[in-house]
UniProtKB/Swiss-Prot annotation:
It comes from Nitrosomonas eutropha (strain DSM 101675 / C91 / Nm57). This is Cell division topological specificity factor. Keywords: Cell cycle, Cell division. Prevents the cell division inhibition by proteins MinC and MinD at internal division sites while permitting inhibition at polar sites. This ensures cell division at the proper site by restricting the formation of a division septum at the midpoint of the long axis of the cell. GO terms for biological process: cell division; regulation of division septum assembly. Belongs to the MinE family. InterPro entries: MinE, MinE_sf.
Length: 98
């Protein structure tokens, strides 16, 4: 193996890595292009409404938008905290609101 062969094989590896990265970027761009622009704002507003009633973290909510040929689906998943005594939780929320 000569010195030229070493540099030649490195170039093809670099090109394939660059091509793979570009394909990933294009796939992400296509995925986000089909999402409605209001989705982040909708997620934030839903989170505010949910927090009025239940204390949840930001990462406890996920919004998924899917688009087929003839329908659009908005899926909302919320991981609610375990509550041992719901009455105490309601009382705590009332105290916090005052």
């Amino acid at each position: 193996m000569s010195l030229l062969d070493y540099f030649k094989s490195s170039k093809s590896k670099t090109a394939s890595v660059a091509k793979e990265r570009l394909q990933i970027l294009v796939a992400h761009e296509r995925y986000y292009r089909n999402k409605p622009s209001y989705l982040p704002q909708l997620q934030e507003e839903l989170m505010q409404v949910i927090r009025k009633y239940v204390q949840v973290d930001q990462d406890a909510i996920s919004v998924k938008f899917e688009q087929d040929d003839n329908q659009e689906t908005l899926e909302l998943n919320i991981t609610l905290p375990d509550t041992q005594n719901p009455r105490n939780t309601q009382q705590d929320m009332i105290r916090n609101a005052l």
